């Protein structure tokens, strides 16, 4: 069995800087997959790019959180349980998961998919911003079941995993816990007919890896070229021409650097 790595550009549509980076990397042939944050200010531009370029796998990055301190967005539906007093979505995935009214959440997720369609794109697949729909943050796994049911209704794949492997760690979760989570995910994925990758490779920004981009690059490429057989998906948010007040320099990595790294990995494993 061959090894496949899907590298998905998350946060498409989050801001103009994200759009510029993703546009450029698609055109260079360094990306084949991305997902749009529909509630965000630059989402329409991203969705229209997707509509004009159906050769790319561009889906919807289902969003229920707004993590930036001074750059925010709110739910399309205005649902009370999905926003703070400011009118914006909550900062943390655990808060979003614990506070969400299931009926309001269903309406919001469907609104995001339908808004993408209204802008002309047909989402190729669905995934989730910050893991706020996985259920593992607070144990509200009914949130995950709802999400997978919606995926099934729309006939869309969802980014989670159907297998566990020591070479593809889930940060902060030992193998036993990963197996327990898999026991929840897999039956619902089968019940609702939702395709998923075999493995989900989560970026793990430890303090050690935050010391420099070069160090992170070296370590992440070691992981990428040693993925197990099957389909593995990983992801990252891309920006260009934009600096943020973050502890990690990774948030300022340029599209030129990403282009070089992708060419290196492509020589070792098959990129999807």
Predicted regions and their residues:
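Terminal accessory/targeting
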Residues: 1-6, 17-33, 37-56, 71-92, ...
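N-terminal low-complexity, intrinsically disordered segments
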Residues: 58-63
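Active-site-proximal segments of metal-dependent phosphoesterases and phosphodiesterases across multiple
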Residues: 132, 136
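Conserved alpha-helical segments that form or flank metal/cofactor-binding pockets of metalloenzymes
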Residues: 68
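DG-centered beta-turn motif at the end of beta-strands
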Residues: 9-12
């Amino acid at each position: 069995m061959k090894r496949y790595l899907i590298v998905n550009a998350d946060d498409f549509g989050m801001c103009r800087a994200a759009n510029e980076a993703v546009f450029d990397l698609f055109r260079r042939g360094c990306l084949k997959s991305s997902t749009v944050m529909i509630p965000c200010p630059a989402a329409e531009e991203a969705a229209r790019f997707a509509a004009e370029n159906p050769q790319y796998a561009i889906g919807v990055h289902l969003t229920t959180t707004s993590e930036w301190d001074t750059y925010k967005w709110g739910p399309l539906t205005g649902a009370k349980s999905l926003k703070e007093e400011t009118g914006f979505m909550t900062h943390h995935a655990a808060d979003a998961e614990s506070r969400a009214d299931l009926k309001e959440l269903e309406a919001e997720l469907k609104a995001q998919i339908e808004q993408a369609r209204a802008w002309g794109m047909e989402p190729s697949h669905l995934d989730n911003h910050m893991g706020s729909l996985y259920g593992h943050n607070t144990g509200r796994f009914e949130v995950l079941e709802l999400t997978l049911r919606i995926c099934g209704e729309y006939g869309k794949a969802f980014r989670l995993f159907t297998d566990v492997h020591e070479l593809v760690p889930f940060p902060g979760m030992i193998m036993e816990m990963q197996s327990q989570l898999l026991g929840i995910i897999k039956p619902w994925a089968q019940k609702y007919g939702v395709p998923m990758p075999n493995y989900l490779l989560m970026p793990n920004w430890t303090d050690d890896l935050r010391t420099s981009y070069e160090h992170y690059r070296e370590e992440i490429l070691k992981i990428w070229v040693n993925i197990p057989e099957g389909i593995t998906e990983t992801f990252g948010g891309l920006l260009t021409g934009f600096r943020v007040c973050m502890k990690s320099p990774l948030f300022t990595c340029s599209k030129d650097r990403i282009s070089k790294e992708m060419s290196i990995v492509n020589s070792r494993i098959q990129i999807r």
